[in-house]
Amino acid sequence: MLRTFETNYLREVTELSSSLWEFSPNEGEFQGNVYPVWVPCCWENLPDFSAYRGTGSFRKEFEAEGNVRLVFKGVSHTATVLVDGKEVGSHYNAYTPFSVMLKDLEPGVHKLEVIADNRFSEKSALHVPNDYMSYGGISRGVAMEELEGAYIEYIHAVPERTEKGWNVKLAVKVVNLEDAEKIVELQVAVDGLFEITKEVNLKAGEEALVEETVDAGTPDVWEMDHPVLYTICAVLSDADGAFDDLASHLL
């Protein structure tokens, strides 16, 4: 499970973690050996690799087509991502999520390979010889999202107390994956507190940041003995109806 609550109801999301992958070390005594591992996984959990420092490949097949977004919640500490043998992305920092976009993917079964690297180097500002362990592996969840022509990349919602109640500062990023201009309708709502609708004009292959400050009235406030969470949900629509969404929690 990637989150303890549903983040999408329209967007098709498949978790690739919480399953068996193939792991192979790329150097050392056991180079080329293949081990079935349960991802998320750090190779230090494997008996032969408790002190292994180097690179290792994690492989998994997936079936998809069209616009596909691979989302990685964390890879320690540097990741190189390949699909069908071709490098499609990379990321440094074990503790931040990242994603890779695959546009117009051919229908069929594809091979995903994530090369994790826990070596110390000049490129690794944080991970230097020290008194804590720099783990190696896919340390957090992985998801595959199958997208339409546009999608919501994120929702940022910051509550602010005012003299009359609460405001919410919204920032919603919408991305156009098509090679033509696209007009969409963005609706953002929070559990009966407010609902707004905006028309968003997206240039070909570009993105737009929709920002708005909304009056949220006088909601229940989260406290230790009264832990109230609200669900904020954003939905994209076009002439054919709603086609993408993203939900999160708001204090």
Task: Pin down the residues of each PLM region.
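Short glycine/proline/serine/threonine-rich loop/turn segments at secondary-structure transition edges
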Residues: 108, 123, 216-231
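Accessory beta-strand-rich segments of carbohydrate-active enzymes
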Residues: 3-9, 15, 22-28, 53-151, ...
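Beta-strand-rich binding/interaction modules
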Residues: 68, 81-83, 166-202, 208-212
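N-terminal carbohydrate-binding accessory modules
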Residues: 7-8, 233-251
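Short, aromatic- and glycine-rich surface loops/edge beta-strands on solvent-exposed regions
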Residues: 111-114, 226-238
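Short, solvent-exposed loop/linker segments at the N-terminal edge
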Residues: 159-166
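Exposed aromatic-hydrophobic patches
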Residues: 97-103, 199, 207-216
